Each structure stands twice: as C-alpha cells, then as structure tokens.
A protein has these predicted regions:
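Mid-chain, well-packed structural core segment of small domains
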Residues: 55-79
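General helical structural elements
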Residues: 45, 68, 76, 87, ...
Length: 110
C-alpha cells in the first residue's frame, strides 16, 4: 500500500493504473507529490458525491474509474468541469450506494 496522505492509502496497482492513465512514465518527487494530492482530493470528492464516506475506490469499479478520470481532469486544471461532464456516472454511483444502504436497513429491520 502507498500512503497518499496521513490515514489514506491506495494499492500500488491503483497508483500504477492512475500513473499510466495520466501518462506519468518517470519517477519525480514533485510530480508524485502533485499526483498524490490530486488522488486524495479525488477520493474525498467521490466519497462525498456518492454519500458513502467509506467508499472503497479499490474494489468499486465505478468509483475506481471516476477517480482515474478525476485525477486526469485535476492534473490538467479542469477539476471544475469534471462533475458536470461525469454527472450521470456520479448520479449512478450515488443511487447504487443509496439503494444498497436502504437494502441493508430493510434486512436489519426483519
């Protein structure tokens, strides 16, 4: 696991996948610092938008792809446009998470 910031880690596999998606092909301390900050922002925003603050971007395919795309936008100075351009994907993730939460509540009420 790679520490992105204190208390937030991602797998080396996900970091490598993000680096590949944004065409980072070299080890540079400043670039890694910027990349990790972008990943941390992305995880925070995606969790917030999904209404699931413990959302696992490693195992949820939609969240994982949203994170990769968010980082791509963010590193290109376009993070403001991300939410608008990915609104259907964000809404789908949120609805799926809310439906799962309702299903869990109904199960525990039985």
């Amino acid at each position: 696991m790679i520490e992105i910031r204190k208390g937030l880690e991602i797998s080396e596999e996900l970091l490598s996948e993000i680096e590949n998606a944004v065409d980072i092909t070299f080890e540079d301390e400043a670039t890694q610092k910027k990349l990790k900050a972008s990943i941390a922002r992305g995880i925070g925003r995606i969790r917030s938008w999904s209404s699931d603050l413990s959302l696992d971007v490693e195992s949820d395919d939609t969240a994982r792809q949203l994170l990769i795309d968010y980082v791509r936008y963010d590193l290109n100075g376009m993070s403001d446009a991300f939410r608008e351009n990915y609104a259907p994907d964000i809404a789908s993730l949120r609805l799926r998470k809310e439906a799962a939460a309702v299903g869990e509540e109904e199960t525990t009420d039985i």
